[in-house]
């Protein structure tokens, strides 16, 4: 961690992350009327942040203001893609065929949003990559981190959030039944 970030700033950043995670969890749980949506979204965001943080650790890059800005951007980008998928799951649940299982519904919902998620991630990645290649040196760290976060966020939105929600829904439904 770079010397520009004081101990107090690190503490404030950790508190801000914890508070924002709880608020996101509550908002998503309220919006989708199911706390499992919120939990799976926040866990996917934790995944994204940890992967990028691991890359920073492996690359021995210093954590500073650029890192914090990238993390906020990645979280915002990733939660947006996750909300799109959750919204489709909710819509499909309203019109669910009685013969269709919940697993099939989640898979269908992810499939319906897959192209949109990939296109959005790919176009954003291309633009950030161009900035990485052609931009000034001071942008390299920001754009590299953002590219990694875009890939990680797309992966977690498509491959983690829906299946994690389904798993929690299935597990907790059995306990309550």
What are these regions (language model features)?
Residues 1-177:
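A structural signal for conserved, well-ordered secondary-structure elements
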